[in-house]
Swiss-Prot record:
Keywords: Capsule biogenesis/degradation, Exopolysaccharide synthesis, Hydrolase, Manganese, Protein phosphatase
Protein name (record): Tyrosine-protein phosphatase CpsB
NCBIfam families: caps_synth_Cps4B
Organism: Streptococcus pneumoniae serotype 4 (strain ATCC BAA-334 / TIGR4)
GO molecular function list: manganese ion binding; protein tyrosine phosphatase activity
Gene: cpsB
Amino acid sequence: MIDIHSHIVFDVDDGPKSREESKALLAESYRQGVRTIVSTSHRRKGMFETPEEKIAENFLQVREIAKEVASDLVIAYGAEIYYTPDVLDKLEKKRIPTLNDSRYALIEFSMNTPYRDIHSALSKILMLGITPVIAHIERYDALENNEKRVRELIDMGCYTQVNSSHVLKPKLFGERYKFMKKRAQYFLEQDLVHVIASDMHNLDGRPPHMAEAYDLVTQKYGEAKAQELFIDNPRKIVMDQLI
């Protein structure tokens, strides 16, 4: 599998705090069958403002750590970019990275961002010649159970990503993210999802869940669909090919 949304670089955002935590995440991801991981540390004004130099420096250390985990584990560079207007200039001047230096950029919004703002932001990114991959579309209230809006964004030229944790079956009691799982299921049923990725941060609260999600998608939608969402489409993104 290929995971295009992950927080594996230590001490740069709300992901791993140490080299050891980074290594544990990589090892668990590899155990689940992931062989390529795009590191997408947060870039968010006012919240995650770690200098690019430090992110890049720690990323290179994580790439070395990956060699200790497995010789065939590939780590690529990227970013999860929270949209604010200044992002456009940074993307245009290549001050923040796309996914593995491709045409694709992983873009996120707040849960309560109005649809018109999402639409406007993505339009501006597309005008730069960059293709947005909308991170965890199940989070956004403006897209909830709204095939028309998601289809409109796809028709504009955007792609969509759902978190593997939200593909899992809801727990009977105390399920905090049940509504997101319902949204993810709706998007999958409507065939509005291009990629499933982990958005892993740590092994305690936010582990990969890739193997379990792959099995569930296979059971519900077939092996070909699972391969498309976990392998084929992510590979095209990493290799800068059209989906």
